[in-house]
């Protein structure tokens, strides 16, 4: 399982939903766990029609689709699941309603191996999050 959550989600905060779920799952499954947690900065799954969303946030759906592709490769070709990680995006900036187009630099890939400063460590119910 891969959970993808936007760090800036103010209606379903990560600290009250995904992070506790990941911690609980680690207590239940321990080292056997196949759960991966991807937390995306500057992203939330609500509010795409709110003023300024385009300048301050990136689309979280893109990361849902990428995670689904990774899971498909895992199930059909035995590709390894990505490490749990923070994906650090870059807002587009600009004028609300007229943000520049998304570029690859705005929406980096989920990587197979997280950089040490982006790795989420889950152990014995504790979820250690990088800033």
Residue ranges and their predicted role:
Residues 1-131:
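C-terminal His-loop and adjacent cap/lid subdomain of alpha/beta-hydrolase
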């Amino acid at each position: 399982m891969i959970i993808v959550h936007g760090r800036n989600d103010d209606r379903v905060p990560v600290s009250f939903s995904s992070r506790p779920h990941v911690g609980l799952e680690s207590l239940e499954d321990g080292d056997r766990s196949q759960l991966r947690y991807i937390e995306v900065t500057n992203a939330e799954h609500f509010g795409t029609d709110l003023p300024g969303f385009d300048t301050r946030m990136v689309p979280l759906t893109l990361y849902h689709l990428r995670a689904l592709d990774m899971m498909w490769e895992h199930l059909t070709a035995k590709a390894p699941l990505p490490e749990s990680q923070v994906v650090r995006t870059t807002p587009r900036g600009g004028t609300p309603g007229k943000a520049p187009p998304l570029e690859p630099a705005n929406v980096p890939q989920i990587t197979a191996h997280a950089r040490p400063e982006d790795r989420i460590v889950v152990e014995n119910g504790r979820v250690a999050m990088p800033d």
